[in-house]
Amino acid sequence: MGGNGHRPPGTLPPMSETPTPPTAPRSTMLVATDADHVHDEVAAALGGDHEVVRVHAGAEVLAAVTAHQPVLVVLDLQIGNMGGMAACLDLRLEQRANRIPAQRIVMLLDRDADAFLAHRAEADAWVVKPVDPLVLRRTAREALAA
């Protein structure tokens, strides 16, 4: 580089001068489970697209939704003393009362027969455990697109 501040043709600017493209903020996804392996499976499947926030009990879901405003909530059917079904119904009641914005809810079920419970809890979609990452990604994408 000469004294006039120009670069020879075809040379790259120093790293300190290279503009960094702005990164789009990642949307937040809330996972409610007390099982570490379930959290790890969900975070591995969806974490590349979303910032993953975890709560360990159904009673913590509403406060976490209020604080983080996730676009997607993943509820394990079996969590603590307030299970995924109760947490899902609680969110839907709060949404209908206009106290929180609407979120898409995916429930993680223990068996196919639990689909009845997920439907009654007004979940947008559900996946039966063990979690297949491809199925969970597709289910989450479809729930968010609905």
Q: In which residue ranges do the predicted regions lie?
A:
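Alpha4 helix (beta4-alpha4-beta5 surface) of REC/receiver domains from two-component response regulators
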Residues: 86, 107-125
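Conserved acidic segment of CheY-like receiver
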Residues: 25-37, 41-43
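His-Asp phosphorelay/catalytic-motif detector in bacterial-type signaling
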Residues: 69-71, 96-104
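Conserved sequence signature across two-component system core domains
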Residues: 29-33, 55, 73, 108
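Two-component signal transduction core modules
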Residues: 73, 126-127
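Acidic, metal-coordinating helix/loop segments flanking the phosphotransfer/catalytic sites
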Residues: 56-72
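C-terminal output helix
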Residues: 131-140
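Conserved phosphotransfer microenvironments
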Residues: 71, 75-93
